[in-house]
Amino acid sequence: MTMPQTFLLSLFFFLLSLPMQAQREGFSVSPVPDAVFQRMKGKSYKSGCTVPRSELRYVRVLHHTLEGKVKHGEIVCHRRIANDLLEIFQELFRARYPIAQIRLIDDFDADDTRSMEANNTSCFNFRRVKGSRSLSKHALGLAIDINPLFNPHVSQGGARVNPAAGRAYADRRKDFPHKLSASDLCVKLFKAHGFRWGGDWRHSKDYQHFEK
């Protein structure tokens, strides 16, 4: 092979690798940076939080919006699931799986209802289970909610829907875009990584929810 041919072949493989390289560069796991922790203090990381900051990780991802645009997303989670989330969101990005937005719940003052109504995908929030004294898996950074407006928590035989704005999506017999179901790629990926899906619960159904 001549020198020009070798150069052209090398250039071809370099250009071929650029999309994958750019994709990898959009994904990372790190300890929670000081600037991010300042955003969390008094919001998702409340006074009396029992999870040490050192146990949390800051995950940056890329995702496709509902309109097909590529956006950056950020997640704070427990270190135990950080690599799982990184791999899952890489697969979802490769599949062009639509996610409305992925922002820290601190952008909504750690108000779970506001975050869900905005269809925001989020993870860590030190709080108790609604109507209970038990800590939520979100409080440990071991649960994440995906496209929550389209995939609400449905209980009391459908009488209670959370968020209330998601009532139109409570009847899962209907077919509509962005519905999480057993055959959905997102559900399959989370289950493959050992997560439990709230859509499999017996007495209530939390279709947005994945926990480990």
Where are these regions (language model features)?
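Bacterial N-terminal signal peptides that target proteins for export
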Residues: 1-8
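Hydrophobic h-region of N-terminal signal peptides that target proteins for export
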Residues: 12-21
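Hydrophobic/aromatic-lined pockets within catalytic cores
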Residues: 17, 93, 195
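N-terminal module-boundary/linker segments of secreted carbohydrate-active enzymes
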Residues: 23-69
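Active-site acidic/histidine clusters and adjacent loop/turn architecture
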Residues: 51-116
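Structured loops at beta-to-helix junctions and adjacent beta-edge loops in soluble globular domains
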Residues: 62-64, 127, 149
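Active-site-adjacent loop/helix surface patches within enzyme catalytic domains
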Residues: 103-142, 151-153
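Catalytic cores and adjacent binding grooves of peptidoglycan-active enzymes
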Residues: 129-131, 135, 140-212
